[in-house]
UniProtKB/Swiss-Prot annotation:
CDD domains given in the database record: RNase_PH_archRRP42
Keyword tRNA processing: no
Protein name: Exosome complex component Rrp42
GO cellular component: cytoplasmic exosome (RNase complex)
Signal peptide annotation: none
Entry function: Non-catalytic component of the exosome, which is a complex involved in RNA degradation. Contributes to the structuring of the Rrp41 active site.
GO biological process: rRNA catabolic process
The entry's keywords: Cytoplasm, Exosome
Family the entry assigns: Belongs to the RNase PH family. Rrp42 subfamily.
Location, primary (coarse class): cytoplasm
Gene transcribed to yield this protein: rrp42
Keyword Cytoplasm in record: yes
Transmembrane feature ranges: none
């Protein structure tokens, strides 16, 4: 057995003993998030942006929007692409190069939560059907990894989309000419999907796992919900099995915690709007 395995075993026993006493390694309750800080409009050259701090986990999200062609199978819909970059400075386990499995999973789950909830109305991003649409890029940079990247990125992505302002566009059907105006407008964001992540450690479920908890967890479950009462994404990873009653508890808790996080995002947006006036 390697030294790393011995240390992991000791840490697992320590965390499990705390959980048996209804405690966590950082004194939070099982359903408590670490402090969440959201600041929008932090990247001047981006259409929208957000800096999110979830405890010591920190992510930066930028929104870029251009005009382009729609996909052939969806001529009446705009395009949205999500990319996650795990900056090597954020964690010793992150390496430079193309996105690894972790980055791909993070991008897919966040993208799915936004897409399936129809939070960003892609149909309203069409300039000329089948010809010209808005193309929106959600670019995520992980600056510091101390656990639960999924929720931090999810918060940052929707906050940045809500913060985004894009130039208005006029299309002349007769000439096919496009005029990009100086006047700006928000993206058609109509819902605020929020992901809530649970770590299963032994027989216990805890919200917003720290890096130490993630390193010894038996499984992870992320549930994305919107304010209309719908679930738009579910992701189980890191092995492990979840009982039906555990999933039902997680769903109920996800709706409750998402409402709290939604208020934090809206407060950050209101604060930014007030500072501009």
């Amino acid at each position: 057995m390697s030294n790393d395995e011995i240390v992991a075993g000791i840490m697992r026993d320590y965390i499990l003993n705390l959980l048996k006493e209804k405690k966590r390694i950082d004194d939070r309750g099982f359903e408590d998030y670490r402090p969440i800080e959201v600041e929008v409009g932090v990247i001047e050259k981006a259409e929208g942006s957000a800096l999110v701090k979830l405890g010591n986990t920190q992510v930066l999200v930028g929104i870029k929007a251009t005009l382009g062609e729609p996909f052939p199978d969806t001529p009446n819909m705009g395009v949205m692409t999500t990319n996650v970059e795990l900056v090597p400075l954020a964690s010793p386990t992150f390496e430079p190069g193309p996105p690894d499995e972790r980055a791909i999973e993070l991008a897919r789950v966040i993208d799915r939560g936004i897409r399936e909830s129809r939070a960003l109305n892609l149909e309203k991003m069409v300039i000329a059907p089948g010809k010209i649409v808005r193309v929106v890029f959600i670019d995520v940079h992980v600056l510091d990894h101390d656990g639960n990247l999924m929720d931090a990125i999810g918060i940052g992505a929707i906050a940045a989309l809500l913060n985004a302002r894009v130039p208005k566009v006029l299309y002349n059907e007769e000439t096919g000419e496009v005029e990009i105006l100086e006047e700006k407008e928000p993206l058609p964001v109509e819902k605020i999907p929020i992901s809530v992540t649970f770590a299963k450690i032994g027989n216990y479920l805890v919200v917003d796992p720290t890096l130490e908890e993630e390193q010894i967890m038996d499984g992870r479950l992320t549930i994305t919900t919107d304010e209309t009462g719908h679930i738009s994404a579910v992701q189980k990873s890191e092995g492990g099995a979840f009982k039906l009653e555990e999933v039902m508890y997680a769903v109920e808790t996800a709706f409750k915690k998402a409402e709290e996080i939604r208020k934090i995002i809206l407060n950050a947006l209101e604060k930014a709007n007030n500072s501009e006036e």
